[in-house]
């Protein structure tokens, strides 16, 4: 069976540094940080008092007020980003066969704020069970793609992948394979997350995962820097329209890139820590290259998982050196989490959009906030430090890893 070619025809982004894909890109290349003091709740008693929140986001500008009240923020974000991507793809909803259009989404946690608030309300009462009737449908992780499909009438495959921070990359790989195998013509894919809540901040603080650089939030996310002390929690959504190449060509769609392949692996090592030698990361990148039919020397750019954690950054770069050998020093490596923070289940989608736009514009966004060299990192690697670099990117890789040892990797290629 001959596999169909799959391309990207639409992008949508709602991030801490920009509420559209164009705003997001402009902020990326200018090296803008999205971190600042938490405004959603009083964080004075928390170890970490800052995060990468969305700015100036008003859901009722995009979604009916009645529906907003029935959606957790992670679903609101999904609706807005997917609408932008569908419009960007110029998909004619009156013409497309909706039975062959799916929605495959990623969310690592889902409706955390809804769960938190309902439980707190119950705990504050006398034990009488008084719950919002929308508690469950607001909270469950699969509800975001459900709402997207209901709005647009898409009747193809519809579900959420949950693999912590690898969730939206897993969703993209599933979407890629459904189209490759001929089961769908178009899939709305991506991911969303809204974990900047008391429970989210408190939980990650309890496991010592977050930076506590409260005196300087904007510089706290510093991947690959020797003084990094944890990630900065972010939120938002990224949406990508994947489409059969012939279907896209027939309707005259703009094509951003071809999706050449995806790879998956497991660390099988520790619940939250990476293998120190990056064994699972080595496997996932090799799997992705094999799936795409590429050689290591074909890759020009890697948007790393790069969370700004002491263990994770070193393990990933060790793995890159192992997989790419001498060619590793020729690759523009970066971590856009230095600007957006860590969007958890939405990270894979948002960072894939950054890699795709790097190909389109011929510019690789920087890894900001780097000032102290880490002696455990190969000095020959080009980590695109502090300033964007011009680069003719033909092939870009996006790495995403999640708690539980989940590893996902996607490869994109500029269309010839």
Outline where the language-model segments fall.
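Active-site-proximal alpha-helical scaffold in enzymes
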Residues: 78-91, 144-145, 149-152, 158-193, ...
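Flexible, low-complexity linker/loop segments at domain and module junctions
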Residues: 1-8, 93, 97-98, 292-298, ...
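A glycine- and small-aliphatic-rich helix-loop capping segment at beta-alpha/alpha-beta transitions
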Residues: 21-27, 113-128, 178-181, 201-214, ...
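Acyl-CoA/ACP chain-elongation machinery
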Residues: 183-229, 262-276, 306-313, 330-381
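Condensing-enzyme catalytic core mediating Claisen C-C bond formation in acyl metabolism
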Residues: 5-9, 36, 215-292, 301
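ACP-dependent fatty acid/polyketide chain-elongation machinery
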Residues: 1-67, 89, 246-258, 353-367, ...
């Amino acid at each position: 069976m001959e596999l169909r070619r799959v391309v990207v025809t639409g992008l949508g982004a709602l991030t801490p540094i920009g509420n559209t894909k164009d705003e997001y890109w402009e902020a990326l290349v200018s090296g803008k940080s999205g971190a600042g003091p938490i405004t959603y709740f009083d964080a004075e008693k928390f170890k970490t008092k800052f995060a990468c929140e969305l700015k100036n986001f008003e859901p009722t500008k995009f979604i009916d007020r009645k529906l907003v009240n029935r959606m957790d923020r992670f679903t609101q974000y999904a609706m807005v980003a997917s609408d932008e991507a569908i419009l960007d793809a110029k998909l004619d909803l009156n013409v497309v066969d909706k039975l062959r259009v799916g929605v495959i989404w990623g969310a690592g946690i889902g409706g955390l704020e809804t769960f938190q608030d309902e439980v707190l309300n119950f705990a504050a009462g006398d034990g009488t069970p008084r719950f919002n009737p929308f508690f469950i449908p607001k909270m469950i992780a699969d509800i975001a793609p459900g709402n997207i499909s209901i709005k647009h009438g898409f009747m193809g495959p519809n579900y959420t992948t949950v693999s912590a921070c690898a969730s939206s990359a897993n969703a993209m790989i599933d979407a890629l394979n459904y189209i490759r195998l001929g089961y769908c013509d178009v899939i709305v894919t991506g991911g969303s997350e809204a974990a900047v809540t008391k429970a989210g901040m408190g939980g990650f603080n309890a496991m010592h995962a977050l930076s506590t650089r409260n005196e300087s939030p904007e510089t706290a996310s510093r991947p690959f820097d020797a003084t990094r002390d944890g990630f900065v929690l972010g939120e938002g959504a990224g949406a990508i329209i994947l489409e059969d190449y012939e279907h896209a060509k027939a309707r005259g769609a703009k094509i951003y890139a071809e999706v050449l392949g995806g790879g998956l692996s497991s660390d099988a090592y520790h619940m939250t820590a990476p293998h120190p030698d990056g064994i699972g990361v080595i496997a996932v990148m090799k799997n992705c290259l094999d799936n795409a039919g590429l050689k290591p020397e074909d890759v020009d750019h890697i948007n790393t998982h790069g969370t700004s954690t002491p263990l994770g950054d070193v393990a990933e770069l060790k793995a890159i050196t192992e997989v790419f050998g001498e060619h590793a020093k020729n690759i523009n490596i970066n971590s856009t989490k230095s600007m957006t923070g860590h969007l958890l289940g939405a990270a894979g989608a948002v960072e894939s959009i950054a890699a795709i736009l790097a190909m389109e514009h011929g510019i690789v966004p920087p890894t900001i906030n780097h000032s102290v060299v880490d002696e455990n990192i190969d000095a020959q690697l080009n980590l695109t430090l502090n300033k964007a670099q011009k680069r003719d990117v033909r092939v870009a890789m996006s790495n995403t890893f999640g708690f539980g040892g989940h590893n996902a990797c996607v490869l994109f290629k500029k269309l010839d």
